[in-house]
Amino acid sequence: MHRARRRIRAEAVTLFAARGCPMPMKLAVLGARGLLGGAVARRARLAGHQVRAVVRPGRDSPAFPMGIEVVAGDLSSQASVLEAVRGMEVVVHAATVPYPEWPRFVPLFADNALAAAEAAGATLVFPGNVYVYGRPRSRFVAEDHPQEPHTVKGRIRLAVERKFLQAHQDGRVDLVLPRYPDVYGPGAIHADFRPVFEGALANKPCRWPLNADALHEFILNDDAAEAMLKLIGTPAAHGRAVHVPGPRAIVSRDFIRLVYAAAGSGEPIVRVFGRGMYRLVGLFSPLARAAYEVAYLFDDPILLDGTLYRSLTGGPHPSTPYEVGVPRTLDWFRTHRAIA
């Protein structure tokens, strides 16, 4: 029954896309408090979709736009997730946990999201990252780049992606798998980037991982959400990873300068958090220890090739310039830093 429903829905999506208009969806977002999950909920509602924001129980709900249904769901409980997404047509699994908790919770949350999407007959959407590739073999990385993760987190993510792709091939779910660089934007600040925003507002030195003069890539959370919705509405993009790059590669120090300029501060003094410091702090901090194994990306960056996205969707990926996205993020952080 679910396979037939998915086939009918895919045909309807194709028909709506051919007419140049998105098909209205019933969309549940797991991890709707987060940086990307919150953006997906907002953008989907703005696009006219019926949105259910699934948040952890026992905490105050963040302010969501009018019209978004907010429900509590414990992602560690399969029964809770099944109930939270009941009746939905799309399940976006955007829930995250702190790095030290990945081995325990990332596979568990993934299994429960998959089971819930399958039970609901829903499309499963899983935002991917670049950890699955390991170290880059080329300047720009396309979807066919070897997947050779050398980190614990990379191997965990690869196992989850392979499980989801196999479920798609077996007809259990329809899978959408956009792959992003580091996401930034209003809603939350990643631990690696928070010292930059704090330093900019105080006009003090900031900390940056490994190499501030290497290239890096970021994508605004609203752009990532918009691209995700586009891929959901593009059946040819289902069942495969599709890269969604940022607006351009940028030297990390130049990104930091944009943050300081937006704050009205002077030229930033950047103190690089080197490998030795990571190892030293990691003796006492599980978070620093876990962050260090993926810090190589700030010295040996993965820059995503967006050719496939353009080919499948017929247009460019959303691309807010850093000169626009950074001030927008800083404005949010200025008023929300206590909870960011």
Where are these regions (language model features)?
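NAD(P)H-binding glycine-rich loop region in Rossmannoid oxidoreductase-like domains
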Residues: 59-120
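Short-chain dehydrogenase/reductase
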Residues: 103-107, 150-162, 182, 190-194, ...
